[in-house]
């Protein structure tokens, strides 16, 4: 009984100390955004909430604005660490909750703290200056590196915390002791990945890195493609929209500097000479080549569509065309690439914490004959025909391992 009362007190203390604004609550699970994903429309949801709501047979839709999308973006690490810093208690609770669910499914989201860049660990943005804390982060990163080089798969068994959580527990506890300091947002938390200045009209690329809108326009003008300067991966979606929640955070915490920089960026955009960029800014890219049929592959049984299979690099889901599957990744969920990502390899890790390395072998996978294998064609087409109310995406995907053709972004 004593322990129960203690738990209740802790929950009450948490609610009093950390009142989380609505904008930082996931629109799907209504809890603190955990490992936030920013869609091309600029709206946010948790990693697993986006994954579960995606459709394995057709394009998916944002639960807020119904904007269509076909790519499962990477976690926005800048926003992840910002929320962890602002709401450490709620974030820790969400971490434990999600980890328990992942252990039950034996399928894990990216372990962000393990691959944390030392520049982030030791910077002022996390208020960490103690050498010991930097060494803890370094040891965690070295552990992942050594495991990968030996070919070991650092899977997380049930009833056991991930290595990164153990390594950073001391760091988290010390942050909680000085809650006021840990919640302070510094300018370093919100710098553009290109100009290294305070973000203005922030946009989040498919890879999860954050830029000023004007900096992304400059990228597109130079190469007609938006190529991230941090990971060198091209955004396959066209021009993303401004993340309004991040913009609001910037305006509230740095009003003078933000307004000053914003006026300069707007002048740059107004004098932009590329008409196609202005078109992207207003309308966004088109997801379908056929305006009369959003799902042309459903009408053609011979279409090379890998239903329920997604690319672990660009996140396209489902994969249309050639699909390459790793023969050496041991995780049950597997590791897949679309043709474009196979031909332009990158160092982007698997979206589900797979320990894929460049020396792994990939083979061409055949697309399943879904229309033939289904007992009733209505099972496949039913959700596509019904577009009323909330998207029926989440009910169409089975748990990892439910099919031999299950994918890393199923």
UniProtKB/Swiss-Prot annotation:
SMART domains: RING, ZnF_ZZ. One of its GO terms (cellular component) is cytoplasm. A zinc finger (RING-type) spans 26-66, 192-232. It is an enzyme of class 2 (transferase). A zinc finger (ZZ-type) spans 306-370. It catalyses: S-ubiquitinyl-[E2 ubiquitin-conjugating enzyme]-L-cysteine + [acceptor protein]-L-lysine = [E2 ubiquitin-conjugating enzyme]-L-cysteine + N(6)-ubiquitinyl-[acceptor protein]-L-lysine. This is E3 ubiquitin-protein ligase PRT1. It comes from Arabidopsis thaliana (Mouse-ear cress).
């Amino acid at each position: 009984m004593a322990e129960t009362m203690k738990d209740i007190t802790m929950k009450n203390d948490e609610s009093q100390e950390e009142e989380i604004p609505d904008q930082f609550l996931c629109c799907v699970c209504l809890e603190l955004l955990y490992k936030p994903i920013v869609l091309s429309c600029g709206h946010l949801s948790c990693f697993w909430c986006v994954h579960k709501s995606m459709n394995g047979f057709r394009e998916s839709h944002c639960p807020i604005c119904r904007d269509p999308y076909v790519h499962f973006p990477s976690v926005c690490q800048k926003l992840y660490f910002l929320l962890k810093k602002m709401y450490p208690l709620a974030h820790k609770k969400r971490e434990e909750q999600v980890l328990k669910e992942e252990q039950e499914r034996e399928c894990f989201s990216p372990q962000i703290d393990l691959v944390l860049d030392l520049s982030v660990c030791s910077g002022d943005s996390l208020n960490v200056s103690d050498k010991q804390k930097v060494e803890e982060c370094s040891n965690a990163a070295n552990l992942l590196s050594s495991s990968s080089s030996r070919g070991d798969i650092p899977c997380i068994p049930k009833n056991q915390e991930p290595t990164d959580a153990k390594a950073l527990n001391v760091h988290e506890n010390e942050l909680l002791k000085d809650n006021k300091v840990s919640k302070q947002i510094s300018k370093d938390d919100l710098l553009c990945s290109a100009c290294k200045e305070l973000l203005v009209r922030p946009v989040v690329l498919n890879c999860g890195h954050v830029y000023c809108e004007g900096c992304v326009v400059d990228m597109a003008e130079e190469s007609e493609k938006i190529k991230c300067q941090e990971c060198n991966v091209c955004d396959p979606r066209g021009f993303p929209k401004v993340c309004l929640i991040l913009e609001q955070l910037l305006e509230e915490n740095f009003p003078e500097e933000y307004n000053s920089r914003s006026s300069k960026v707007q002048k740059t955009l107004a004098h932009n000479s590329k008409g196609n960029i202005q078109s992207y800014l207003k309308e966004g890219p088109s997801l379908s080549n056929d305006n009369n049929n959003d799902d042309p592959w459903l009408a053609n049984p011979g279409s090379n569509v890998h239903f329920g299979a997604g690319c672990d690099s660009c996140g396209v889901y489902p994969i249309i065309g050639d699909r390459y599957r790793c023969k050496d990744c041991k995780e049950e969920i597997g590791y897949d690439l679309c043709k474009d990502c196979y031909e332009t390899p990158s160092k982007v890790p698997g979206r589900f914490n797979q320990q894929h390395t460049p020396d792994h072998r990939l083979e061409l996978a055949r697309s399943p004959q879904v229309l033939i294998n289904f007992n009733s064609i209505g099972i496949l087409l039913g959700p596509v025909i019904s577009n009323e109310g909330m998207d029926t995406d989440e009910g169409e995907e089975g748990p990892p391992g439910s099919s031999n053709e299950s994918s890393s972004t199923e």
